[in-house]
Amino acid sequence: KDMVHWELIGHAITDPDELDLSDIRDSHGIWAPDISYSNGRFIIMATLRLNADGKRDNNVMRRQVVVSSDRPEGPYSKPSWLEVDSIDPSHFVDDDGKHYMVISPGINLVPISDDCTRVTGDLIPVWPGTGERCPEGPHILRHGDYYYAILAEGGTGYGHGINVGRSKNLFGPYEASPYNPLMRQLDPNAPIQRTGHGKLIEDANGDWWVYYLMGRPNRGIEVANGKAPKPGEIRVPGAYTTVGRETGLDPVRWLDDGWFVINEGKGPSNEQTAPDLPEVVYPKWQRDDFDSDTLDVHWQFVRRPAPG
């Protein structure tokens, strides 16, 4: 409720018969879930990364999964599978009511049904990005007279970032922002690194924010010749983000020229003033006596335990 404190309330897919990951390799499985709200329903889209390598005909690497519910805590619908072999889906509804799955690489639009359960047309490429490596994590935002195409670029390691382009036509052409990269950590010794894959949100006061992926490495990154690493480059073995990808929040400001900047162009903040919303702090889950027949919702595993 305050955009800072969060409480785990459930899971979108709970039936193993609906999503069997028992044979899926480590680091594969469900990737990059995105949640949106449309027509009174919460819609979650995600990628299922399969074991295939995509190097042979009909060797599908990825499928897209969609579930929905009229309540954020669920229960959610049975999964619908959209056969689009890519990653990082998100949901966009245009002013004319048409629904699209937005998917990488770059910004591509896949026409889908109003309930988001079926592909209804061919994939439409609209913006490849700025030319940096790994254009992914795509979102489309309609604001004022423009469509904004928001991308993660630079790879998901050190040098990860957020770039944006805009167009007055959904299908382009898009021009890149003169303020790119909108988000990137340029200080190799900063405690927050690998910042990218962001999604904008407007709060109840009309203020804008971006949630984004980030990581906190065990130690800093070596600087060569006084320069920070290039996008995707790691110079020090062992500069690992042990707890994995985390979530950052920074303010967004719309400019008079119609573009926006994140955190005044300063990169990710180490500390930030919270949104001006009533604070809601949930009790921390710290103990489990295992006195129930079912595990608490907070227990999570990479895969379900094997039977027996």
Predicted feature locations:
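Carbohydrate-active catalytic/glycan-binding domains of CAZyme proteins
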Residues: K1-G308
